[in-house]
Design a protein with these regions (language model features):
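A charge-rich, low-complexity, intrinsically flexible signal that marks solvent-exposed coils, linkers
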Residues: 17-139
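Short, positively charged and aromatic/hydrophobic N-terminal segments
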Residues: 2-15
Length: 139
């Protein structure tokens, strides 16, 4: 229990630091992606990133059955709950901060989910173009 509390404290402090400087793909303040389920590398609801975020979880995407199946086939099962990480499992319609590289893989395979541009971190542009994101923007 102590370890979990300490981990939450560290993540909270890292998230507060990341949030202070986070911008979206339009150079505007990053907006909330989703609070239910709580998403983001820091589980703060935002697609914030930092040096500890190896996967670069910066693209706010709306889950689809097609994408959930695609990512599971790549070894990342997002649909099955994992109580150890307090992860509820995702279903179509949920929003989640995806790894930029995984979203690009899905894009290349015609399986990319729609994205909330205002909630997608500017760091995503290191991996995909703004045109690719706009093509999959939630209208």
């Amino acid at each position: 229990m102590y370890l979990k509390l300490m981990l939450n404290f560290i993540i909270f402090n890292m998230a507060n630091n990341a949030m202070a400087q986070s911008l979206n793909v339009f150079g505007q303040p990053l907006l909330l992606c989703c609070n239910e389920p709580k998403t983001g590398f820091y589980r703060d609801g935002f697609c914030n990133t930092g040096s500890n975020d190896i996967g670069t979880h910066v693209i706010c995407a709306e889950m689809t059955a097609e994408f959930l199946s695609f990512t599971k086939s790549k070894g990342n099962d997002l649909s099955t709950p994992n109580p150890f990480y307090a992860f509820p499992g995702l279903k179509p319609g949920d929003f989640w901060c995806l790894c930029a590289i995984r979203w690009k893989e899905a894009y290349d395979a015609n399986a990319a989910p729609k994205v909330k541009l205002e909630s997608t971190h500017e760091k995503a542009l290191d991996f995909v173009t703004i045109e690719q994101l706009i093509e999959h923007a939630i209208k």
